[in-house]
Amino acid sequence: MCSEARLARRLRDALREEEPWAVEELLRCGADPNLVLEDGAAAVHLAAGARHPRGLRCLGALLRQGGDPNARSVEALTPLHVAAAWGCRRGLELLLSQGADPALRDQDGLRPLDLALQQGHLECARVLQDLDTRTRTRTRIGAETQEPEPAPGTPGLSGPTDETLDSIALQKQPCRGDNRDIGLEADPGPPSLPVPLETVDKHGSSASPPGHWDYSSDASFVTAVEVSGAEDPASDTPPWAGSLPPTRQGLLHVVHANQRVPRSQGTEAELNARLQALTLTPPNAAGFQSSPSSMPLLDRSPAHSPPRTPTPGASDCHCLWEHQTSIDSDMATLWLTEDEASSTGGREPVGPCRHLPVSTVSDLELLKGLRALGENPHPITPFTRQLYHQQLEEAQIAPGPEFSGHSLELAAALRTGCIPDVQADEDALAQQFEQPDPARRWREGVVKSSFTYLLLDPRETQDLPARAFSLTPAERLQTFIRAIFYVGKGTRARPYVHLWEALGHHGRSRKQPHQACPKVRQILDIWASGCGVVSLHCFQHVVAVEAYTREACIVEALGIQTLTNQKQGHCYGVVAGWPPARRRRLGVHLLHRALLVFLAEGERQLHPQDIQARG
């Protein structure tokens, strides 16, 4: 098991780096893409967040070699949930093409469509909604017509001719001259006749030798081509690219060919084991236009090498040879982005393929940016840098600036008013400390004299309990969250320690308060405005470690940047081993319970004269 976990961790490292050759090598070594690790997720869940072509190739490699598109994490999330929540439309389409079930729900009862809508990823939501609509339409039409299904050996492309190709996924194909593998696959279902890619030269003539292909269909299909460039490569082409064949350095474009679909000689069973039929939309009268939901791929084979007929043992020919490098792997497969395909109309060549620009943000700036958004990132390494940079970019462009700094879980609750149903998690937290083991040395002992408290700014609440009836649940929660400026753990012996500290600064000259901590300065500012501080006590009569754990979950949900707390809290017991997302959901749940306490008790302000100074 230790060896399996180690391989799975290495596989996830390769996925973070988006290195397809390393992913394939680890899969051949036996790495399990569906193995859930200690953080609650498997490699296939991490790969589902792919956005760039290299990441999509990694996801395709996992799905080809045993990756389950419906694998569950400890939170019952599937890869489709991950892709929908992160707004990764291409990864979502690829998973759907491999049999991902959009009807599965996570532990909160949410479908991928629900997550896409909550996070504002409209393209992903549209794909899932269209899929649901088409599925219901086909089911209704099928029930009305009762047409017989075509025989498995019927020539032609599979699926109805008017069905749009929503995704194209990588599928293993027989080796080419460079000992690499690539292919295409589409809608899941019984495979039909294989449709190998045909390589053409820059004049459009077929490079296949006469008699090598058996023509079996007149259907139109889209061919992805590499066109050898006659001009000198661009100045930013890497120097090592000159050693590649001319077709590797050429321009790329997608053409529409009204020609026959070739079928390689050999047994149909061998070919069907490696390729699945493509489901394509026939071109309209105005000519072919690339669909915004399709992903153009290219043939990696040399310009004059037709796909070979597979031979026994061909499944082993995709291994990484010793003389091949990752650089060759990167250049061997070139992709068109959606923007390039749409700007050229799918007909004209585009400029030379360029690598994605390397981020100029330093590690320190990246850490500061994530912490400013309420995140608590681990140390940045070459494996985590790209993931954190993507997370920072998405958070910066996410809608709802009034929720910036809060966790994604709390931001979703603030937008919708829906609170995660994690009462079972709170019960598990409380159960462990109901009768704590006296043999263990718990922090501050096992006396049940602690509680969690929130300091609120009444200038934000505006007597929220009195006017709550006129607000929606989301508005009540938003007002409550905006008012919180400190979360702490208190005891009955020291219930107002921070207010006492602020009282010591009260009345001094204005030159001195800046020496106080941010929390005290906030209290002094509230008092200076003529208001009092609201100290909300909740979750009382618990041992210290339980109060610390509740405090930590709440701080994680709120985001420390939105508070005057100077450090993150500490979790104890079973909660310490939970994934951060699970702790944040519990924090949102606890905040909602604290809101209910506040609404029930009413707003009580504490002014300087209300605090008894210590002797």
Curated annotation (Swiss-Prot):
InterPro entries (UniProt xref): ANKLE1, Ankyrin_rpt, Ankyrin_rpt-contain_sf, GIY-YIG_endonuc, LEM/LEM-like_dom_sf, LEM_dom
Pfam families: Ank_2, LEM-3_GIY-YIG
Residue span of region Disordered: 138-210, 283-315
GO CC term (a single one): cytosol
Domain GIY-YIG span(s) in chain numbering: 448-566
Compositional bias segments (type: Polar residues): 283-294
Entry GO MF terms: DNA endonuclease activity; endonuclease activity
PROSITE patterns per record: ANK_REP_REGION (PS50297), ANK_REPEAT (PS50088), GIY_YIG (PS50164), LEM (PS50954)
Ranges: ANK repeats: 39-71, 75-104, 108-137
Tissue expression per record: Expression is predominant in adult bone marrow.
Enzyme class: hydrolase
Main location: cytoplasm
Entry keyword annotation includes DNA damage: yes
Gene Ontology annotations of biological process type: DNA damage response; double-strand break repair via homologous recombination; negative regulation of mitotic recombination; nucleic acid metabolic process; protein export from nucleus; regulation of lymphoid progenitor cell differentiation; regulation of myeloid progenitor cell differentiation; resolution of meiotic recombination intermediates
Domain of life, per lineage: Eukaryota
Comment block on domains: The LEM domain is required for GIY-YIG domain-mediated DNA cleavage and induction of DNA damage response.
Assembly information from the UniProt record: Interacts (via LEM domain) with BANF1; the interaction may favor BANF1 dimerization.
Record protein name field: Ankyrin repeat and LEM domain-containing protein 1
Species assigned in the record: Homo sapiens
